[in-house]
Amino acid sequence: MNSIWARLRLASSQLPIGGYSYSQGLEAALDNGWVRDAESARTWLVDQLQLNLARFEAPLLAGLLRAALAGDWAACDAASERHRASRETRELAQESRQMGFSLQQLLEALPELDDAGRAWLARQDPPNLAAAWAMAARAWRLDAEEALSAWFWNWLENQLAVLMKTLPLGQLAAQKLASSLLPDLDRACAEALRRPAVEGSAAFGLALASMTHETQYSRLFRS
């Protein structure tokens, strides 16, 4: 099977894992006035890409992807636990668990994942999103770069959807913003594949946004 179909499937916002319900702190950044327009939105997204995702989140996922594809279940366990421990707030932890569980349910209902992958996924209680994403890559025969690029695109598309629902930002403006971010996305993905997985991150702004979102008066999103 052509891997482009599997990559598009994994990257799609139509993947039934509930990503549209979450903003990953962006809604709180909007409420606090840190993000006000397309320019400040771009600054927020580039900071997330360069300072958080490319340096910690994505290298950790890349390591988990490589371990899953190789069938190194001990390494999968270690990477999955690091990912679980790195969720700094209740909302971010719940988001990862809910989306991971939904992707697990999807993979269990489809024929592609092998017995070893199913057995490992079943031992997670429940799997976080990174763990389930790695098993989806194993099921659909995607290498680490393909699965990681799908993850980056899924993240960007979700963030743009949040902005279109919360800012005076139309579809054309969102596509212009996406065009301006593609080189940053490319660099972040390449950097993540080069970097070793590290033990922790220091995305204080994201953590603060997520914490304040828990008590935000009016919310559209669950994170």
Swiss-Prot record:
Keywords attached to this entry: Chaperone, Cytoplasm, Nickel insertion
Residues in coiled coil: none
Domain of life: Bacteria
Alphabetized Pfam families for the sequence: UreF
HAMAP family hit by this protein: UreF
Assembly with partners or alone: UreD, UreF and UreG form a complex that acts as a GTP-hydrolysis-dependent molecular chaperone, activating the urease apoprotein by helping to assemble the nickel containing metallocenter of UreC. The UreE protein probably delivers the nickel.
Protein name per UniProt: Urease accessory protein UreF
Taxonomic lineage from the root: Bacteria, Pseudomonadati, Pseudomonadota, Gammaproteobacteria, Pseudomonadales
